[in-house]
Amino acid sequence: MCEMSEEYRESAPKGPPPPRLGTGDQKCVKCKEGLPVVVIRAGDAFCRDCFKALYVHKFRAMLGKSRLIFPGEKVLLAWSGGPSSSSMVWQVLEGLSRDSAKRLRFVPGVVYIDEGAACGQSPEDRARTLAEVKLALQTTGFPWHAVALEEVFSLPPSALRCSAQEAAGTEGAYKAAVDSFLQQQHALGTNGVERQSQHCAQDPQSPTGPPTTAQTQALSRLFDSVKTLTAKEELLQTLRTHLILHVARNHGYSKVMTGDSCTRLAIKLMTSLALGRGAFLAWDTGFSDERHGDVVVVRPMREHTLKEVAFYNRLFAVPSICTPALDTKAPEKASIHRLMEAFILRLQAQFPSTVSTVYRTSEKLVKAPRAGCAAGPRCLLCMCTLDVDTADSATAFGAQTSHLPQMQTPVTQARAAAGPCCCAGMGGAPGCCKREDPRAQVMEQLCYGCRVNMKDLPSLELLPPYILSEAQLRSQRATAEQEIREYLLGDSEDEAGTGES
């Protein structure tokens, strides 16, 4: 029997709790002398100096072992103001300083994309943020370019064309370039790098002024018309990439650095799988992305986790600017990106090897087309090769492709039934009156992932003009090639004719 006078709760201990064993005597796991200030993983406690050495070594090793960036090459740093990209700019800034043991040999520049109109910021908030951005960029001493996202409405269609890529240099070519660069710097004197950096810093900045009211309204209408947050984030990423590449080409940059961290790439890998972009994971998450031809995107921060970035920025006072994004204050299930982010971070909190496992899996992906599949056309938006067998209707891509010819408006069907082209017998171009449905014209030039996102955009006419113009140009080129295909000589016929002669 229970008695009312019984007390089942133990009395609270008096005095301070006993100290944990080993915390006072714990030393840095690397130098075994300094007091640890950072615990990256369980049991990995580093002092301030050893943590900085590890952090810098990861960044330098990622650039050094790839040997993609040659000495004297112009590299554009894509800076968003966030922790990872700010840390990347800080690493480059320290790597170019005179006190650095192994100095970086490329010529950097910084680009910032103002996305305030897409995120719903007021003009006053955008002006305040832009003033902070310009002040932060001026302190770096690098040439900088602050561009508004509205500039996508003035891009030329050539921004979506993959230019010819130079052949990758061999190890001997890289060593020869290093020797030539060192000899040049020795001839210029000890301050050769500073002179080159100062000359680059004196280059005029982007002359783009504030966006026009019409451009801002067009961008707002575009993002307001998108139904889901997932499609908005994908569209924003696509337009941002196009604008950065356009700035890089206009100012002579052959490489673009992004601040994607290990944690962010793990989330991106899972998100891309959910969005149907599994065929392009090697380009979306790898160290280098060569899909754009003359401009290569590199990710030197892919070995750093968000935890390491946060600790480094805190310990060494790396400045950053916090700006609202599309998913700011959005619930967990508002988009696939937010859902995957919450899923990965929750798993990482319970199982600390989650991010590293997903990240190491992405390193095993190979950038190669399928066997027997020649390099075909590229996606209009993401610029990836459409390496999918469209004849296989068992796949979602094949099923969508088979229905595209049936997507015709009543106007198109009426024109087709009206008879031959009006200009066919008057010296005009055959089929000039034949106009496809603009939506079908764009959709047939997209990969599966981009098609899924474009379904949430009711009208494609709200897209920037350069996308619609390039889609129309590609469609006309494909039609012309189809009409003259029977008059072209194939490779086998050409060789046979040469042998007979």
Curated annotation (Swiss-Prot):
Keywords: Acetylation, Cytoplasm, Phosphoprotein, tRNA processing. InterPro entries: CTU2, Rossmann-like_a/b/a_fold. Pathway: tRNA modification; 5-methoxycarbonylmethyl-2-thiouridine-tRNA biosynthesis. It is found in: Cytoplasm. Belongs to the CTU2/NCS2 family. Plays a central role in 2-thiolation of mcm(5)S(2)U at tRNA wobble positions of tRNA(Lys), tRNA(Glu) and tRNA(Gln). May act by forming a heterodimer with CTU1/ATPBD3 that ligates sulfur from thiocarboxylated URM1 onto the uridine of tRNAs at wobble position. This is Cytoplasmic tRNA 2-thiolation protein 2. It comes from Bos taurus. The gene is CTU2.
